[in-house]
Amino acid sequence: MAVGKNKGLSKGGKKGLKKKIVDPFTRKDWYDIKAPSMFTTRQVGKTLVNRTQGTKIASEGLKGRVVEVSLADLQSDADAERSFRKFRLIVEDVQNRSVLCNFHGMDLTTDKLRSMVKKWQTLIEAHVDVKTTDGYLLRIFCIGFTQKDQMSTRKTSYAQHSQVRNIRRKMVSIVTDEITKCDLKGVVTKLVPDAIAKDIEKACQGIYPLHDVYIRKVKVLKKPRFELSKLLELHGDGGSKTGEVGETGSKVDRPEGYEPPVQETV
């Protein structure tokens, strides 16, 4: 056994007792998340980031963050048809204490997808890569199910392989025609009411009746070069003002001379 002094005991205490505990949230700032002007609710939440310190800039830490918001929250609507559709928004620029987001994708919730898959029917899926007029390359996934004839006594509603191919071909052609004629803002405007899926359901009635037709997923594969002017145009006035149109709130009645209490900690 080696003989020597125990430095930890000679100092009269354990290591780390005199170290000050610093709350990490004191070094962070809150930023408002602003959605594009295509949605009713513009302020969808807040996000945290460390303050600018040395070479680490706060705005650089915010750019590229992706948030996922339900369409019901974006449209301030409790409609069940919108609650299962999720939109992804990506932070592209920072203006004062607001982060400006752009469309980054769409998806359906897992429980909605699982609830639609049932026995005695045919599931039909299709996907296609299309480019918008402003240079965004999108991959669109579509899903639909065959519908049982109410007048028929058959238990099943299976479609033939030729009918499935024709329906899939019709899905691809309608999605391509709708997306290639508009820019990204127009695509989001069509995705909010799910107008493309309704057109597909109507066009496929002559081949085989469908139900539960949805645009299942939208992925952004490629983007054009970032331009701040286009992002500000997408947000209307840029979202840098605190009292921006679309921020909802309620007025609180307070007595005259009311002053908020002084907080002990921040």
From Swiss-Prot:
The keyword Translocase does not apply. It comes from the Eukaryota. Its main location: cytoplasm. One of its GO terms (cellular component) is cytosolic small ribosomal subunit. GO terms for molecular function: structural constituent of ribosome. SMART domains: Ribosomal_S3Ae. InterPro entries: Ribosomal_eS1, Ribosomal_eS1_CS, Ribosomal_eS1_euk. GO terms for biological process: translation. Residues 237-266 are annotated as: Disordered. Keywords: Cytoplasm, Ribonucleoprotein, Ribosomal protein. It is found in: Cytoplasm. Belongs to the eukaryotic ribosomal protein eS1 family. Component of the small ribosomal subunit. Mature ribosomes consist of a small (40S) and a large (60S) subunit. The 40S subunit contains about 33 different proteins and 1 molecule of RNA (18S). The 60S subunit contains about 49 different proteins and 3 molecules of RNA (28S, 5.8S and 5S). This is Small ribosomal subunit protein eS1.
